[in-house]
UniProtKB/Swiss-Prot annotation:
NCBIfam families: PRK00103.2-4 (NF000990). It comes from Flavobacterium johnsoniae (strain ATCC 17061 / DSM 2064 / JCM 8514 / BCRC 14874 / CCUG 350202 / NBRC 14942 / NCIMB 11054 / UW101) (Cytophaga johnsonae). It catalyses: pseudouridine(1915) in 23S rRNA + S-adenosyl-L-methionine = N(3)-methylpseudouridine(1915) in 23S rRNA + S-adenosyl-L-homocysteine + H(+). Keywords: Cytoplasm, Methyltransferase, rRNA processing, S-adenosyl-L-methionine, Transferase. This is Ribosomal RNA large subunit methyltransferase H. Pfam families: SPOUT_MTase (PF02590). The gene is rlmH. PANTHER family: METHYLTRANSFERASE (PTHR33603), RIBOSOMAL RNA LARGE SUBUNIT METHYLTRANSFERASE H (PTHR33603:SF1).
Amino acid sequence: MNIKLIAIGKTDNKSLQTLIDDYTKRLSFYIKFDLEIIPDIKNVKNLSESQQKEKEGELILSKLSATDQLILLDENGKTFSSVGFSEELQKKMNSGVKTLVFVIGGPYGFSETIYKKAQGKVSLSLMTFSHQMVRLFFIEQLYRGFTILRNEPYHHQ
């Protein structure tokens, strides 16, 4: 199985980017992982929230193939413990999913088109985080999930 994380907009904070790069490298020992950044939409001042979500949705859809399984990182998604998330990853691998795609949306969330296309939603927390920090937290949780599946000493119960 391959895992792809799609996010809108680049990470401006160099310290965060360094950590994202570190966990991305660590994760590559367990699974093929790609972080794909969609550039911020230009001239958003001239767009309504729904128009911006639609444009971002079109860009997200252009990055997907027909066989991808799409999971949205969404505040209303299902929450997991780290162990529960690792079990969910194992189920996806066992089910024969070729590419599991997680998406961090733009500042206003996702368009209805994206919600309809998604096979699931995951929430990292009831708290709100910057989208740049969500990238780091999520990639770290992927890494943690794979160390749990391999019974490696990174995660402590």
